[in-house]
Amino acid sequence: MTTIVSVRRGRQVALGGDGQVTLGAVVAKASARKVRRLYHNKVLAGFAGGTADAFTLFERFEAKLEKHQGHLMRSAVELAKDWRTDRILRRLEAMLVVADHEATLIITGAGDVIEPEQGIAAIGSGGAYAQAAARALLENTDLSPKEIVTKALTIAGDICIYTNQVHVIEQLD
């Protein structure tokens, strides 16, 4: 799996992920890019799960953003609806975290669109570790969202065997 974490402080949001791709018990790639900017660089998105499945979902989500003029919630709900009802999409195994200046959402293959509390979203095998670290840092420091994401990914990578220390982090100011 992987670790994807997003932290929001006001309208500033950062989203990051590690680069490890595993095939069974073997690390197949250490520097995969699981975080992207979408819709004219106004939306951040990261995935955990099957890489090919995630790319399909990125394409679908970007099409929804275009159709709905960048409206994050509506695009996420429409993607989740398609994901839940389409026979082919239903088989895709991935989760997404998406964020813009206004909201952060987790989108699942079960059709869930969740807006997490406290401005923190985390998915993947190291998600719980990253979420705990990010929450402690957000509540007890003045670090920027990008600094918190970096530290949370580092901590998750130290604990989770499916998460490495090669990070890609994007930020919207």
Swiss-Prot record:
Activity regulation (record text): Allosterically activated by HslU binding.
Residue stretches spanning the membrane: none
Record's subcellular location: Cytoplasm
Record key words, sorted: Allosteric enzyme, Cytoplasm, Hydrolase, Metal-binding, Protease, Sodium, Threonine protease
Superkingdom of the source species: Bacteria
List of residues binding Na(+): 157, 160, 163
Gene3D superfamilies given in the database record: Glutamine Phosphoribosylpyrophosphate, subunit 1, domain 1
Record carries keyword Mitochondrion: no
Keyword Ribosomal protein: no
Family, as annotated: Belongs to the peptidase T1B family. HslV subfamily.
Xref: HAMAP family: HslV
Its biological purpose: Protease subunit of a proteasome-like degradation complex believed to be a general protein degrading machinery.
Subunit structure: A double ring-shaped homohexamer of HslV is capped on each side by a ring-shaped HslU homohexamer. The assembly of the HslU/HslV complex is dependent on binding of ATP.
Name of the protein in question: ATP-dependent protease subunit HslV
Species of origin: Nitrosomonas europaea (strain ATCC 19718 / CIP 103999 / KCTC 2705 / NBRC 14298)
